[in-house]
């Protein structure tokens, strides 16, 4: 199903659909007239003699050099090819598709001055599955994501490399195989394609979507751990959280209550339990995971604005003037990425502490050491917990802010930059680590629940436990564990663990 984009009002849900499903996207036809009007204005400037940055001048520090009208097409070609300086591994197809959709949205606002031909080619590439090879490194997040977006633009011109039908090939070959033709860029079109924050924004959105999916799964594993440790649900009482007032905390507590409702394990110790309070990793889940949820929701609002923004330069304004500005500076995206990193780090940190609690007989209220059937002969989940600690610590290091690390570039013309691109890209590794941490907690918590037999957990959590056991059987004795950890992490990453419980329980990303 094709996602129809209405630039300026594209909802987060449409972007998430493109990311998770690979759905093609195209602009609503109602925006064609605005695009064509701006393109006509650029053509007028080319026909005249007045120098206008990015149209008939050089770029960056070379902006004072006037370009003859006969060289305008060559200028655009040279711009793209000279800026194809990315290094590192190719970005994955889901990221590149999102980048292309975001570029459509920006161009569709009618302020970039590109021809409809250019827009139609991007739409066709998405529809046919021509995915430009974009190296992951090379952007400092201002003046836009120049190098990575140049690799996208190069394929549109028949240069560079692309993936098509599962094969890596030259850009012109990929277009030909898909029945498409390369475009010759007109005035300003090269700059419009590469001068934007779409790579940083796509990476940040991917980090956001993955972090939220992990956060939803963490509520399930947190509830399972609460029951496995025979923890109290009293700290999730709604009045406690209403008195504080944070929406994420209130929603998180409500989800935990619903997940634990009807648990025979909980009912068995609701009276006469000599423990007065649980450790913070059980008791303070609403406060910690709720704060993370609030942070992700705030970031979601920022990135929705950025996804709908025009981040090109110069811009064709509503009065038909062409004005240079700085919308290419990705500082909002850099801040958003740093905030997502904090949330990812903390969701994993409190999950890891619950894993540590479950494997420690001094804390787990009757569970065997390391959740092993015969501790000593078997090591159980001893080293799985160590792995979770390693991943947690790695995420702590990766969570350090990228946005504060500016450096001047381009002969000091671009003297302050955002570092949004790598700040957002590290979220992919951080969320991959988080999926594994939560997967390990799922294994530990379900194993702990089984040790409480004949008592069982709640109906909702039984469904989640069944999903875990669908990919990893009960650990009766020590075995090769890497496959179990991968399967559990994949269960979280795919969204299948979150989908195992009834719809409407887990908090949504948008308020």
Swiss-Prot record:
Query: Which is one Gene Ontology cellular component term of this protein?
Result: cytoplasm
Q: Where is this cross-link: 5-imidazolinone (Ala-Gly)?
A: 142-144
Q: In which pathway does it act?
A: Amino-acid degradation; L-histidine degradation into L-glutamate; N-formimidoyl-L-glutamate from L-histidine: step 1/3
Q: Which Pfam families match?
A: Lyase_aromatic
Q: What is its EC number?
A: 4.3.1.3
Entry's SUPFAM superfamilies? L-aspartase-like
Q: Which GO terms describe its biological process?
A: L-histidine catabolic process to glutamate and formamide; L-histidine catabolic process to glutamate and formate
What keywords does the record list, in alphabetical order?
Cytoplasm, Histidine metabolism, Lyase, Plasmid
Cross-referenced InterPro entries = Aromatic_Lyase, Fumarase/histidase_N, HutH, L-Aspartase-like, Phe/His_NH3-lyase_AS
Residues carrying 2,3-didehydroalanine (Ser)? 143
Q: What does the PTM comment of the record read?
A: Contains an active site 4-methylidene-imidazol-5-one (MIO), which is formed autocatalytically by cyclization and dehydration of residues Ala-Ser-Gly.
Which catalytic reaction applies to this protein? Answer: L-histidine = trans-urocanate + NH4(+)
Query: What is this protein's expression induced by?
Result: By histidine.
Specify the domain of life of the species encoding this protein.
Answer: Bacteria
The record's subcellular locations are: Cytoplasm
GO MF terms listed in the record are:
histidine ammonia-lyase activity
Cited Gene3D superfamilies:
Fumarase/aspartase (Central domain) (1.20.200.10), Fumarase/aspartase (N-terminal domain) (1.10.275.10)
Query: NCBIfam families given for it?
Result: hutH, PRK09367.1
The family note in this entry says:
Belongs to the PAL/histidase family.
In terms of PANTHER family, this protein maps to: HISTIDINE AMMONIA-LYASE
What is the protein's given name? Histidine ammonia-lyase
Source organism per entry reads Rhizobium meliloti (strain 1021)
């Amino acid at each position: 199903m094709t996602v129809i984009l209405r630039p300026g009002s594209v909802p987060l849900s449409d972007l998430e659909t493109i990311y998770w499903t690979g759905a093609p996207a195209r602009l609503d036809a109602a925006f064609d007239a605005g695009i064509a009007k701006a393109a006509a204005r650029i053509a007028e400037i080319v026909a005249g003699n007045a120098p206008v940055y990015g149209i008939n001048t050089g770029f960056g520090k070379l902006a004072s050099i006037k370009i003859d009208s006969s060289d305008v097409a060559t200028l655009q070609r040279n711009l793209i090819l000279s800026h194809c300086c990315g290094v590192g591994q190719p970005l994955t197809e889901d990221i590149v598709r999102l980048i292309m959709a975001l570029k459509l949205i920006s161009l569709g606002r009618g302020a970039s001055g590109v021809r409809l031909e250019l827009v139609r080619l991007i739409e066709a590439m998405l529809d046919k599955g021509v995915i430009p090879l974009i190296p992951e490194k090379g952007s400092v997040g201002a003046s836009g994501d120049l190098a990575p977006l140049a690799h996208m633009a190069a394929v549109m011109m028949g240069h560079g490399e692309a993936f098509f039908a599962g094969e890596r090939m030259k850009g012109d070959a990929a277009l030909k195989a898909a029945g498409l033709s390369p475009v010759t860029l007109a005035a300003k079109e090269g700059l419009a394609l590469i001068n934007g924050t779409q790579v940083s924004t796509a990476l940040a959105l991917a980090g956001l979507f993955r972090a939220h999916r992990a956060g939803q799964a963490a509520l399930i594993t947190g509830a399972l751990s609460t029951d496995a440790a025979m923890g109290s649900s009293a700290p999730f009482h709604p009045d406690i959280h209403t008195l504080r007032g944070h929406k994420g905390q209130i929603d998180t507590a409500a989800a935990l209550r619903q997940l634990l409702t009807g648990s025979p394990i909980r009912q068995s110790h609701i009276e006469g339990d000599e423990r007065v309070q649980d450790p913070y990793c059980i008791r303070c889940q609403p406060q910690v995971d709720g704060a993370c949820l609030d942070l992700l929701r705030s970031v979601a609002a920022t990135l929705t604005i950025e996804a709908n923004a025009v981040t090109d330069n110069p811009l064709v304004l509503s009065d038909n003037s062409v004005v240079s500005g700085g919308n290419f500076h990705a500082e909002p995206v850099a801040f958003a990425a740093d905030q997502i990193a904090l949330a990812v780090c903390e969701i994993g940190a409190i999950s890891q502490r619950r894993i540590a609690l479950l494997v420690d007989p001094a804390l787990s209220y009757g569970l065997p050491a390391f959740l092993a059937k015969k501790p000593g002969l078997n090591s159980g989940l001893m080293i799985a917990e160590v792995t979770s600690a390693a991943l947690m610590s790695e995420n702590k290091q990766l969570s350090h802010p990228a946005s504060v690390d500016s450096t001047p570039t381009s002969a000091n013309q671009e003297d302050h930059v955002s570092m949004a691109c790598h700040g957002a890209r590290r979220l992919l590794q951080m969320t991959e680590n988080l999926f594994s941490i939560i997967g390990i907690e799922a294994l530990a918590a379900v194993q702990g629940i089984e040790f409480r037999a004949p008592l069982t957990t709640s109906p909702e959590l039984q469904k989640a436990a069944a999903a875990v056991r669908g990919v990893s059987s009960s650990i009766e004795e020590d075995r090769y564990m890497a496959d179990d950890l991968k399967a559990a992490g994949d269960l979280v990453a795919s969204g299948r663990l979150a989908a195992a419980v009834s719809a409407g329980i887990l908090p949504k990303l948008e308020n």
